């Protein structure tokens, strides 16, 4: 009897365990905090191929206190065409754009002009902003194409996602045991209707 009860308990637990989600069911927004820093670091290095001498200095960091992302030494790779042209602009490098993207911010380019009091004030440069935002969209697109390509990375991210977010299955209500005293016998309720009544009762 104990074995049978234990088996039933295991089956009941297995029945309520949510199915693990696969890569095709998981959306990864660039900058999502559940993605390890090393994954973003790898993406940056593979996309921008920084100069060998500065590669180890340019690091993506995340503040535990604020959740903000930053890229250290983002000005170190000045002669990189990918950073300055392909994925960046002459006014904003790809490292600056990636940092803003990780923080879910739209990039903007400002010119600073002096007012009548000699104080510098920022004025949005619409043309340069449009170019920078075009590069930002390109980086997002490249990230979406890249994120699931590597099998090891895919398995790692699926495991982290399922452990972090997919541990609780929404409660389902079973109303099969409910007796409807005095109800018109001509009326038969469908299973989902009975379960909905159970939801209200419990």
Question: For each predicted feature, which ranges?
Answer:
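Charged, low-complexity intrinsically disordered regions
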Residues: 1-167
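ASCE P-loop NTPase motor core, strongest for the SF2 helicase catalytic module
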Residues: 160-202
């Amino acid at each position: 009897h104990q074995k049978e009860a234990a088996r039933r308990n295991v089956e009941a637990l297995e029945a309520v365990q949510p199915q693990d989600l696969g890569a095709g069911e998981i959306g990864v927004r660039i900058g999502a905090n559940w993605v390890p820093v090393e994954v973003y670091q790898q993406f940056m290095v593979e996309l921008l191929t920084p100069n060998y001498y500065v590669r180890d200095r340019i690091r993506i960091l995340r503040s535990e206190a604020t959740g903000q992302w930053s890229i250290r030494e983002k000005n170190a790779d000045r002669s990189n065409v990918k950073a300055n042209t392909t994925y960046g602009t002459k006014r904003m490098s790809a490292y600056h754009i990636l940092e803003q993207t990780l923080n879910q911010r739209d990039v903007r380019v400002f010119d600073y002009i002096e007012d009548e009091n000699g104080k510098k004030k920022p004025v949005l440069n619409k043309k340069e902003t449009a170019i920078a935002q075009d590069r930002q969209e390109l980086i997002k697109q490249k990230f979406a194409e890249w994120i699931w390509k590597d099998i090891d990375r895919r398995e790692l991210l699926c495991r982290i996602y399922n452990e972090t977010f997919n541990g609780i299955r929404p409660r389902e209500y079973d109303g099969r045991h409910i007796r409807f005293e005095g109800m018109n016998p001509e009326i038969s309720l469908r299973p989902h209707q009975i379960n909905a009544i159970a939801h209200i009762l419990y």
